[in-house]
């Protein structure tokens, strides 16, 4: 294989790898999640409006599990706030504001990936 052919092969492989990484990022958001979590200490959700539950379901689940809402707030009563994100018409998710990584860890231990099926975003402020 000549030097020119090796260079061409390298370019083709590099383009293929770059395309695969871009595709992976657009579907799984690895980099976005890493930046949100590691740099900002936030917990991001990457769902389209169509993928979010109905706003009425979000409100209903929050009412049904009010004791868990209170447990979350009791982690740091003066600094944790829980709201509904209704930026998508008719759809919703939870936003939990917390002051520290330790609080975030405790919230994640209580909730896991969702609040009884409702996606939640965590914001460190």
Question: For the regions a protein language model found, what residue spans apply to each?
Answer:
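Short, Lys/Arg-rich N-terminal segment immediately upstream of the first membrane anchor
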Residues: 1-6
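Ser/Thr/Pro/Gly-rich low-complexity linker/stalk segments immediately outside membranes or between
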Residues: 26-52
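Conserved short beta-strand edge segments in small beta-sheet-based binding/regulatory domains
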Residues: 114-125
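Hydrophobic membrane-insertion alpha-helices, especially the h-region
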Residues: 7-28
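Short amphipathic alpha-helices in soluble, non-transmembrane regions
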Residues: 104-114
């Amino acid at each position: 294989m000549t030097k020119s052919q090796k260079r061409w092969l390298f370019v083709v492989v590099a383009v293929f790898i770059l395309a695969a990484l871009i595709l992976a990022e657009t579907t799984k958001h690895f980099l976005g999640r890493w930046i949100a979590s590691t740099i900002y200490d936030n917990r991001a959700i990457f769902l389209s409006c169509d993928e979010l539950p109905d706003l009425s379901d979000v409100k209903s689940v929050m009412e049904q599990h009010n004791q868990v809402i209170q447990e979350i707030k009791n982690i740091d009563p003066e600094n944790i706030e829980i709201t509904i994100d209704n930026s998508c018409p008719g759809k919703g998710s939870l936003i939990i504001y917390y002051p520290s990584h330790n609080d975030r860890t405790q919230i994640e231990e209580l909730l896991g990936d969702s609040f009884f099926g409702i996606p939640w975003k965590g914001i460190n402020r």
